[in-house]
Amino acid sequence: NYKGKESLSRVVMNQTFEDMKEIVRKNPFAQHIGMELLEVTEGYALGRIRLAKQYENIYGGMHGGCAYSLADTLSGIAASTYREYVTMLDASMNYLLPVEHTEYVYCKARVLRHGRKITVVRVELLNDEQTLLIDGSFTFYSIRKRDE
């Protein structure tokens, strides 16, 4: 049982940027990789992590799982901005360029389609120069509406 479950559920009920930042702050794995939430609007989330040695793969670039974790979290936040509890159904990522030689890795998550039950989110991971490194698509199922 997750210790912060009650407080996390309470935080998820609101949709302000500060509340979404609190969700990231209370997520132990997001904190472990130093994830920062920079912007949230309806259907959109922007965040970043600092590229660090402990996140590298054997070739010196960012490990794919670390990039996926950033995209997973940001796409979930973007999908949840419609006051719904969501769970991921499917995800696909295209690793276009190695993630290296950058201070930060940014993730932009934008809702492409928000339906009654299904939400599709496009993610883009970029370096400091805003070069597209990874893109992907995440599909979420809306479990139920949250109370206002």
Predicted regions and their residues:
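Terminal targeting signals and extreme-terminal segments of soluble enzymes
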Residues: 2-148
